[in-house]
Amino acid sequence: MNITTIGRGVIGGGLARRWERAGHKVTLLGRDGGDASDADVVLVAVPSGSISVALDKVTGLEGKIAVDATNAYAGRDEQYESLAHEVKAHTRGPVAKAFNANAGVLYDRIGDQRVAPGCLYAADDEAQVVTRKLIRDAGYEPENVGGLESARALEDFVPGVFSKLTLAPAFYRFAAPGQL
């Protein structure tokens, strides 16, 4: 799969390395933007206050599947239901909210775990299959919390829960008894 990441930092760069190891072709774009025409899917991994600015500098986004990994730490544009909906307004394609509840500083330690850690995600129907594949190819187990209408709850969950954890950054996994 051809993946373009918009953002080359801890999240964008870290996921790019994991996906390249899984056999994907990854193009990393930074602040200057670029072209995503060849991408099958686009990862948005920029500060939340920079989503529109970053996406305005990228051509070839129209109709692409986009995975939004942003969190609202840098604020949000309240004209959108969620940050994922802000991404959707720019790409006009299927969108998933994923990887925003996973600590990028731990990407290199995923393989050391006894079981695959979880990755919460919310996605449009048309983005479900690709999103689950990218989550698994990054080393996580997908944990679906619903359609894109659930993206705001997932965005609000992260600062509300993870900022309170004394063990953060941490892996997590939701499983029924006996599954771990």
Predicted features, each with a name:
Residues 117-180:
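Active-site-lining helix/loop region of Rossmann-like oxidoreductase modules
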Residues 3-5, 44, 121:
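Hydrophobic Val/Ile/Leu positions in short beta-strands of Rossmann-like dinucleotide-binding domains
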Residues 70-113:
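Rossmann-fold NAD(P)-binding glycine/threonine-rich loop
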Residues 1-34, 38:
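NAD(P)+-binding Rossmann beta1-loop-alpha1 motif at the extreme N-terminus of oxidoreductases
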Residues 61-62, 91, 138:
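Short, structured coil segments at secondary-structure junctions
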Residues 33-65, 69-74:
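Rossmann-like NAD(P)-binding element
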